[in-house]
């Protein structure tokens, strides 16, 4: 494709809608943004959404660090104690389903640690009040078992009974939620991701005897507005005001299943989440989004956006089917981003095995096929609290991070992954075990932590890695190479990414679609001059290494420009649909 044809295609693309991803409505686009920037260069970008510059450290608050022992409430629960409830396994293995002391102060005390790794946001599990006892209903959970809640507590925060009140295990006398978000932002430049729940409350039936707070919901004044009364959902009375918040069918385990058709439910959650946004929440993560119909979320998000039109929202739709989770990204369904579960599957399959082929990672990207409203705004990850941690070597984690922080999407890293904590373990085998201050101090000398810090800072300082279009070059065996290109207004940057997941040094010979100019190694600072007399790069990348070369000038390679024009047109045609 010649240059004149490329520019013609770019001109055609100006008739497309300039809305960038309905989940945020966060950026007003210049009317000519797909054609020319400053009347000189065509604009290329995956997204203009400011949130794409974020990288997120996700932690389960109770299991991070105990910064204040006065809020542990170790004697809470009576005959159903809630503190330190171990699940013992073979060979000394252990998990725990009780509270272990992590709190806001533990997070704030280690905010510099999180910031220094290169993260810009911190996502905590839900902050809302949970019941004070271990659940005495359901099937009794044991080490290594799945989908059982008997004997567990709400240490994780997802069994809320008052969404307007912070759980007593989290704040300190001198550190409220508002204090936490303010200090995170002002002292450490860390934004706060609020984990919200709309699908369920706490375990609500099958108890030997009714327990306080279980199956109950309280309002901002502490008044009881909903109560399951330890009754099976099918026996609830919709005409009973205390039952009207709930559906009359079962949901997840014994959790109360919130009635998505009750306007009072929408009013309740709108008020609660607006309260926490006003106190400093910067973005929202939506728990179990697929368990509620699209119309519920659309109404709730529309209400929130009336007050905060630029807020970024991403949901957890636990499915490996891209077409399914992509439904949430459509404007008519609420228009949010999602956690990239298909990406998680591909990433772990590639980096858990030394014999894997890099080409197998490409299937989840969907760069320009219209599957997602905007693939560049998806939240990418390899570990979380609901599934087995990635079962990889230290080198596998290094390779995964090198990919996560250079490929399309917004990276999320789960606490402890920087030291290969509880490798391969699911929830009740240690996935959610307590990290603690000692491990954090040790982490600063860990090889994964070191390499993660390097690549996270590269992304933090590169607009191309944050928002640029991705053009793949070679993915084969243990090596991968690709471009990320951002070109808009006066900001121009191309990143050439070279990844090596083998134990040995790899040599890259790059001449395909290579623009002329002065390229700089983002980590080492070494410069490479490419001109008409030298249209070739020869780079050696260490074993389990990443090299990112940056060119801070407009694209001048006709073949690359043609590919970018074509991809830009397809991407924004999908966005405008």
Where are these regions (language model features)?
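Carbohydrate-interacting/catalytic domains
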Residues: 2-11, 15, 22-60, 65-66, ...
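Active-site-proximal helices and loops of the catalytic beta/alpha 8
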Residues: 32-39, 181-182, 186-188, 200, ...
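Substrate-binding/active-site clefts of carbohydrate-active enzymes
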Residues: 42, 48-54, 62-279, 299-307, ...
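Structural preference for beta-strand elements that scaffold enzyme active sites
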Residues: 56-58, 121, 189-193, 283-285, ...
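Conserved, mostly hydrophobic/aromatic
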Residues: 59, 114, 124, 163, ...
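Active-site-proximal beta-strand/loop segments in catalytic clefts of secreted hydrolases
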Residues: 60-63, 125-128, 195-199, 287-289, ...
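A generic structural signal for short coil/turn motifs at secondary-structure boundaries
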Residues: 69, 388-391
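A generic structural motif
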Residues: 312-318, 415, 521-525
């Amino acid at each position: 494709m010649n240059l004149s044809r490329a520019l013609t295609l770019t001109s055609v693309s100006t008739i497309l809608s300039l809305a960038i991803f309905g989940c945020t409505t966060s950026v007003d686009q210049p009317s000519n943004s797909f054609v020319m920037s400053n009347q000189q260069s065509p604009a290329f970008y995956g997204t203009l959404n400011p949130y794409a510059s974020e990288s997120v450290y996700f932690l389960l608050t109770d299991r991070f660090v105990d910064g204040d022992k006065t809020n542990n409430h170790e004697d809470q629960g009576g005959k159903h104690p809630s503190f330190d409830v171990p699940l013992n396994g073979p060979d000394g293995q252990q998990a725990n389903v009780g509270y272990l002391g992590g709190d806001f102060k533990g997070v704030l005390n280690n905010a510099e640690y999180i910031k220094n790794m290169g993260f810009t946001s911190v996502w905590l599990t839900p902050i809302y009040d949970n019941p004070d006892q271990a659940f005495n209903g359901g099937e009794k959970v044991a080490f290594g078992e799945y989908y059982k809640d008997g004997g567990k507590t709400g240490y994780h925060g997802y069994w809320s009974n008052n969404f307007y009140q912070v759980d007593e295990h989290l704040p300190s006398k001198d550190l409220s939620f508002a204090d936490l978000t303010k200090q995170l932002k002002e002292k450490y430049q860390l934004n706060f991701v609020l984990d919200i729940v709309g699908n369920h409350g706490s375990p609500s039936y099958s108890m030997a005897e009714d327990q306080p707070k279980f199956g109950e919901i309280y309002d901002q004044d502490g008044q009881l507005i909903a109560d399951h009364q330890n009754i099976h959902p099918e026996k609830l009375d919709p005409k009973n005001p205390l039952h009207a918040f709930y559906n009359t069918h079962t949901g997840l385990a014994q959790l109360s299943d919130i009635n998505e058709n009750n306007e009072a439910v929408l009013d309740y959650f709108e008020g609660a989440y607006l309260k926490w946004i006003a106190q400093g929440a910067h973005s929202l993560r939506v728990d179990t989004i697929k368990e509620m119909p699209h119309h519920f979320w659309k109404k709730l998000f529309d209400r929130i956006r009336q007050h905060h039109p630029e807020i970024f929202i991403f949901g957890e739709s636990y499915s490996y089917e891209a077409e399914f989770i992509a439904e949430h990204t459509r404007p008519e369904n609420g228009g949010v981003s999602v956690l990239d579960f298909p990406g998680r599957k591909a990433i772990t399959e590639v980096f858990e095995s030394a014999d894997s082929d890099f080409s197998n990672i490409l299937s989840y990207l969907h760069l320009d096929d219209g599957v997602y409203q905007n693939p560049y705004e998806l939240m990418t990850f390899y570990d979380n609290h609901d599934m087995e941690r990635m079962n990889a070597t230290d080198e596998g984690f290094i390779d995964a991070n090198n990919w996560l922080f250079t490929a399309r999407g917004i990276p999320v890293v789960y606490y402890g992954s920087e030291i290969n904590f509880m490798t391969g373990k699911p929830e009740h085998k240690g996935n959610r075990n307590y990290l603690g201050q000692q491990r954090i101090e040790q982490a600063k000398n860990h090889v994964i932590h070191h390499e993660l810090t390097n690549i996270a800072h590269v992304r933090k300082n590169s607009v191309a890695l944050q928002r640029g279009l991705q053009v793949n070059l070679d993915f084969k065996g243990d090596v991968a190479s690709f471009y990320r290109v951002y070109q808009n207004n006066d900001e121009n940057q191309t990143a050439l990414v070279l990844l090596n997941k083998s134990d040995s040094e790899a040599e890259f010979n790059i001449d395909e679609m290579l623009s002329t100019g002065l390229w700089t190694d983002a980590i080492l600072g070494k410069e490479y001059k490419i001109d008409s007399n030298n249209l070739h790069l020869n780079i050696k990348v260490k074993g389990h290494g990443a090299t990112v070369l940056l060119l801070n000038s407009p694209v001048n390679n006709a073949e690359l420009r043609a590919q970018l024009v074509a991809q830009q047109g397809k991407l924004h045609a999908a966005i405008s649909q």
